Amino acid sequence: MTKTIDFYFDFISPFSYLAQVKLPDLARRTGCVIEYRPIDIPEAKIAAGNYGPSNREVVPKIKVMMADLERWAAKYEVPLTFPASFACSDWNCAALYARGQDQAEAFVTAAYHRIWGIGIDPRDQNELRGCAEDVGLDADALCEFVRSPAGQGEYRKARTQAYQRGVFGAPMMFVDDQIFWGNDRLDFLESYLLD
């Protein structure tokens, strides 16, 4: 029976970007499928009872995180450029549209490349439209979904279900009753899937 990796991510997360760099190949090697599940990290933290400051507000922590991000990007041989803003909600919602069109992997990969590889401004709707078009999605339909009450409702429902499941950050990968948090847990995930 094919196992499913529930991949909880937020385009605001550079560590989710790094996980997405490796996750599709990992899934193919292990015969799994990925279910892409966008969340909102600040909202997830609060839902889990974490009311502390964001990582960007803790100066010693952000210095270490920045160094780690550079190391991971070099290890994975991918570009890493901080985006012009962290307003990624529309992109998260758009991932649900892409999932409904069986284009989640392509869209998420292309979106992460734009946001964290190139460093675009996620607030720029032309970037969102361009990303949709690059992977063969109808940009008008995607943007309409993102703006619609139905699309926003689907995104809200997806987030609520994630938090009820215990999602408190990203990236998080769930398989069976196992949880793997962070791109640095991909080896553990692969070992579990191969056992």
Curated annotation (Swiss-Prot):
Query: What is the activity-regulation note?
Result: Activated by salicylate.
Query: What InterPro entries does its record include?
Result: DSBA-like_thioredoxin_dom, GST_Kappa/NadH, HCCAis_GSTk, NahD-like, Thioredoxin-like_sf
Top-tier EC class: isomerase
For whether the record's keyword set contains Lipid metabolism, the answer is no
**Residue spans crossing the bilayer:** none
Instruction: Determine the domain of life of the protein's source.
Output: Bacteria
A GO molecular function term, named singly, is: glutathione transferase activity
Amino acids binding glutathione: 13, 181-184
Q: What is its EC number?
A: 5.99.1.4
User: What reaction gets catalysed by this protein?
Assistant: 2-hydroxychromene-2-carboxylate = (3E)-4-(2-hydroxyphenyl)-2-oxobut-3-enoate
Name its GO BP terms in alphabetical order.
Answer: glutathione metabolic process; naphthalene catabolic process
The free-text note explaining how the cofactor binds reads:
Glutathione seems to stabilize the enzyme, which loses activity rapidly in the absence of this compound.
Tell me the residue numbers annotated for binding substrate: 45, 55-56
Under the heading Pfam families, the entry gives: DSBA
**Does Isomerase count among this protein's keywords?**
yes
- What does the UniProt function comment say about this protein? Involved in the naphthalene and naphthalenesulfonate catabolic pathway. Catalyzes the reversible glutathione-dependent isomerization of 2-hydroxychromene-2-carboxylate (HCCA) to trans-O-hydroxybenzylidenepyruvate (THBPA). It can also use 2-hydroxybenzo[g]chromene-2-carboxylate as substrate.
Q: Which family does it belong to?
A: Belongs to the GST superfamily. NadH family.
Its name, as the record gives it, is: 2-hydroxychromene-2-carboxylate isomerase
